[in-house]
Amino acid sequence: MKVLIAGDSWGCGCWDKIGNTHRGLELFLQMKGHIVTNLSVCGYSNTEIYRSLKTVDLSEFDYVFAFYTNPFRDIISDNLYSKYFDVPDYTITYKDVLKMYDELWCNSYLMFDSLNYPIHMIGGHHKLEEIESTKNLISFIPSIREMFYKDYVQPKIVYISTVFKNYLKKFDRDTIDFLYETYNVYLNLQNIQQEYFYPDGYHLNAKGHLILSGRIEEFMK
């Protein structure tokens, strides 16, 4: 099969001891005889993942898989929501965060759907919302963490340091507490995810990528 993978660091693979990635997912699929093109880049936002997919002819591939990342990354990549972050003395509330989140994930699905080709979505850094209303998006794995840990429920809104850390003074206290609470949920998972996840508690290790590649290969049979 000709397989296309797009995403952020979750699509790249897992880290070795010196900080490089071995691109495990594509490697394991190649070992099974598949021809794999991997467009994933660490730190990519959903918009950047979408743009990477636009650089290739999707019809040349039998299957296209895209890792869905934290929608708040688009605040940085496209300088969105300056009305909240750049206005002096404006305090961002939890209501604002919810509004931004709903707009961001909805817009990202519309982007991916506009490619007019079946995209098998994988919830990596962020869990997928319902996508039944789209024409071309398939919810292949809504949440990798929930796939490995059946008792775990991934939070809807997740603190992401590259976005929120530089803007903490803009949030009210209740919103800051909420964001850190979701972050602590991730940190607490580090103690139980060691079998399949890298020590950072976020990314799959080689064993996790091997299982994920097996799930993908089984689906493509």
Question: What are the roles of these predicted feature ranges?
Answer:
Residues 47-55:
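Metal-dependent catalytic neighborhoods of phosphoester/phosphodiester hydrolases
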